Amino acid sequence: MRSQWLKNRKNDKTPTQMYYAKNGIITEEMRYVAKIEQMDAEILRSEVARGKTIIPANINHTNLVPMGIGRSLKCKINSNIGSSSVSSGVEEEVEKLKISIKYGADTVMDLSTGGDLNEIRTQIIKNSTVPIGTVPIYQIIHDVGSIENLTISQMLKTIENQAIQGVSYFTIHAGFLLEFMPLVAKRKMGIVSRGGSLMATWMMKNHKENPFFTAFDEILEICAKYDVSLSLGDSLRPGCIYDASDAAQISELKILGDLARRAWTKNVQVMIEGPGHVPFNEIASNMQLERVLCDDAPFYVLGPLPTDIGAGYDHITSAIGGTMAAFSGASMLCYVTPKEHLGLPNAKDVREGIVAHKIAAHIADVALGKKGAIERDHAMSDARYNFDWNKQFELSLDPDRAKEYHDETLPQEVFKEAEFCSMCGPKFCAYKISREISKNSCEFYKECK
């Protein structure tokens, strides 16, 4: 779909969606996203121009279907996949990608740290119609062997190679400054971000400033060349509710706002990454603070998890916090799986995490009156009341699971037209009884049509 669009713009010096938007141009990607979001294309262009919405769409990811992330759009979901040094490979990660897309992930991040990282990423991008994000520091360390060997030249080389491959957004841990290290010492759990912990190690060993911060202008040049969006990473996100909203977290958030403004001057799209573990009563204020400090750049949050004791069920704790975050202004939720804090998720865990967070995002969209959200709920109500079982499966966020559960007790096709399920049976079904009452009332009063 994008090949012809990109061909028409191949000679443009700054091919970013933000550049076009600032110059009054509504790109094909903007028109597509506006149609999907049921909004005016000119309004969307203005949002992109002002940094309030991003359309992550690397010019080298030609089979990508455009999507947008921003507070005025429906809340989006990201799925994390990726190999580790002890588990998974190319086929497994492509399978996780396909599961992610099937169950509704709007973007997917490849967080691979083991195996042939370039081949894994190549196959993921090749098979993906959604934007792919990465955390470049993982490959940088993988390639140089240890954090001590990291150089800015190697860092920039890896970042550009990933941009050439077609990565649509980078998580860059540029907001964690050397001066924040004393704030970390006051925490119960220190640094829980992998990228953040690596940056801390490098800064302490070299007694120098964060290299991502130092080379930020060069990173922006690469991003502008390929239209790679930046996801400014929260290295100091709280890893437990005790550390939530502390000086370390807020100090970094202020720097992320400064970096976002620098990126906008170079026509690079930006979203801000957020917490983390946050008590439920602090989630809304965290969302509002980001809007103030980061000029309403899209907020991309991990959870937040409002409790620390949900091990094995953290997709639920995260979805609870994510609902409040989305309602309070978050633009995208990073899913959490049941394996969070316990191990590398498999395809089944990916499915569970995505659906839980699709539910959270949808609840917020309905509450906020986002266009096209509540209509699906109304259609489901009609299907339920009319015993249209196949329609109910189709409208569910996880159609396969809905059908599986129904068919556990009533698998025969004849029961797809039955006016009851196995919960109440034919005599005690409230819907059926209610329909009869309604029918009889209409006949008695002769007022119904």
Curated annotation (Swiss-Prot):
[4Fe-4S] cluster binds at residues 421, 424, 429. Its EC number is 4.1.99.17. This is Phosphomethylpyrimidine synthase. Catalyzes the synthesis of the hydroxymethylpyrimidine phosphate (HMP-P) moiety of thiamine from aminoimidazole ribotide (AIR) in a radical S-adenosyl-L-methionine (SAM)-dependent reaction. Substrate binds at residues 80, 109, 138, 173, 193-195, 234-237, 273, 300. Its cofactor is [4Fe-4S] cluster. GO terms for biological process: thiamine biosynthetic process; thiamine diphosphate biosynthetic process. The keyword Lyase applies. It comes from the Bacteria. One of its GO terms (molecular function) is carbon-carbon lyase activity. Gene3D superfamilies: 6.10.250.620, Radical SAM ThiC family, central domain. Keywords: 4Fe-4S, Iron, Iron-sulfur, Lyase, Metal-binding, S-adenosyl-L-methionine, Thiamine biosynthesis, Zinc. It catalyses: 5-amino-1-(5-phospho-beta-D-ribosyl)imidazole + S-adenosyl-L-methionine = 4-amino-2-methyl-5-(phosphooxymethyl)pyrimidine + CO + 5'-deoxyadenosine + formate + L-methionine + 3 H(+). It comes from Campylobacter hominis (strain ATCC BAA-381 / DSM 21671 / CCUG 45161 / LMG 19568 / NCTC 13146 / CH001A). It is an enzyme of class 4 (lyase). Zn(2+) binds at residues 277, 341. Binds 1 [4Fe-4S] cluster per subunit. The cluster is coordinated with 3 cysteines and an exchangeable S-adenosyl-L-methionine. Homodimer. Pathway: Cofactor biosynthesis; thiamine diphosphate biosynthesis. Belongs to the ThiC family. The gene is thiC.
